[in-house]
Amino acid sequence: RHVAYTMGKYGMSLCVLGMADEYRGKVAVNALWPKTVINTAAVQNQLGGVPAVQAARQPSIMADAAHAILSRPMASASGQFFIDEEILRETGTTDFGPYRVDPALEDNQLLPDFFLD
């Protein structure tokens, strides 16, 4: 159903695994996946317009999760596939309400990412 997205995720996955091995001990290479749909132009224009955007999270959740990963010591993880919400929970975040596009929705009403559903 989502060939281009699937190919992109698969390619990213192979790059993470390959580069993590190639650059072992020099740089950590990881992937970060969203737990839910993220409010992006692609979601607005291709996935479902306003209804999809309303059931999405803000891009800032990915930025905060990336910051959490990049703040770790390099030796702590490489070749890993992280999920934004899980990383933030590990750092103590418990309220994900501020990341919702529509604050009236509960987390269980948000659209899950294609590959995590």
Tell me what each language-model feature is.
Residues 1-26, 33-50:
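Catalytic loop of short-chain dehydrogenase/reductase
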Residues 31-32, 49-117:
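C-terminal helical subdomain
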